Amino acid sequence: MSSFVTNGYLPVTLEPHELTLDIKTNIRNAVYKTYLHKEISGKMAKKIEICKDVELPLGEIVNNSVVINVPCVITYAYYHVGDIVRGTLNIEDESNVTIQCGDLICKLSRDSGTVSFSDSKYCFFRNGNAYDNGSEVSAVLMEAQQGTESSFVFLANIVDS
């Protein structure tokens, strides 16, 4: 995983009942709820600091809500094709084999190996190696996929140890 820090404005939408004396708290909560640990366009905000010494730009009324661009210092995380990650092998059935790596889900394609069911548990076989469901494995990221709200998703192949 790689990361970078940038300054920017994050747009958030506030409802009329949120425009009270607690507006700073409501803005902070809206920024965190909308952006923190959410995968957007291949990157995920891991840390957000709202700049308190910068004035807020004027809000814009949109459909009976107020859109405010909030000045922030944002630490983003992202993954590259070719990165090697380590996680837990999860076999739900023959066609759904993934590796869970925190904020990353690696999907294994059918040609990555074979799934077998023996002794009341699934096993994944690749190049003569057997990997039990729930075991720790390493994988190389092959292709970025559409992510979920709070996870990156990549096609990957297990790295033989």
From Swiss-Prot:
Keyword match Transcription: yes
Reactions listed under catalytic activity: RNA(n) + a ribonucleoside 5'-triphosphate = RNA(n+1) + diphosphate
Compartments where located: Virion
Keyword Thylakoid carried by entry: no
Domain of life: Viruses
EC number: 2.7.7.6
Alphabetical list of Pfam families matching this protein: Pox_RNA_pol
Upregulating conditions: Expressed in the early phase of the viral replicative cycle.
A GO cellular component annotation in the UniProt record: virion component
Keywords, ordered alphabetically: DNA-directed RNA polymerase, Early protein, Nucleotidyltransferase, Transcription, Transferase, Virion
Family the entry assigns: Belongs to the poxviridae DNA-directed RNA polymerase 18 kDa subunit family.
Physiological role: Part of the DNA-dependent RNA polymerase which catalyzes the transcription of viral DNA into RNA using the four ribonucleoside triphosphates as substrates. Responsible for the transcription of early, intermediate and late genes. DNA-dependent RNA polymerase associates with the early transcription factor (ETF), itself composed of OPG118 and OPG133, thereby allowing the early genes transcription. Late transcription, and probably also intermediate transcription, require newly synthesized RNA polymerase.
Name used for this protein in its record: DNA-directed RNA polymerase 18 kDa subunit
Gene label: OPG119
